[in-house]
């Protein structure tokens, strides 16, 4: 995976995120409006209704149309995960922040468990 190499993230970790998020289905959509393999929230559609302290939560994100392209979706998801890793300093915390707001550490732990089983 050229994008995981560029951001120095193990491709198996990205595969684990994709498996947890979408089961590998590039056409996956969540009830909350997340799109594609890495289930990225776009700036339009259902996600446009989410309001944060300073306005729409996902205003700076790509559109649904952008995220429907599997390669773009992976590239953007990796970039998001890398930013979170740089901010938190470890993958467990970065994955917790990447996942849905109401799931907490269990989301990160599920992905790390999937990741630990890759290559076995």
Give residue ranges: language-model regions:
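Catalytic glycan-binding domains that act on GlcNAc-containing polysaccharides
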Residues: 1-120
């Amino acid at each position: 995976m050229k994008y995981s190499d560029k951001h120095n993230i193990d491709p198996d970790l990205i595969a684990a995120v994709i498996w947890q998020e979408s089961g590998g289905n590039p056409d996956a959509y969540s009830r909350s409006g997340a799109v594609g393999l890495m289930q990225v929230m776009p700036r339009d559609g259902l996600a446009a209704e989410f309001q944060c302290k300073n306005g729409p939560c996902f205003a700076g994100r790509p559109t649904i149309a952008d995220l429907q392209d599997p390669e773009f979706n992976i590239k953007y998801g990796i970039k998001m995960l890398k930013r979170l890793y740089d901010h938190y300093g470890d993958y467990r915390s970065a994955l917790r922040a990447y996942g849905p707001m109401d799931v907490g550490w269990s989301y990160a732990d599920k992905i790390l468990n999937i990741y630990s089983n890759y290559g076995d």
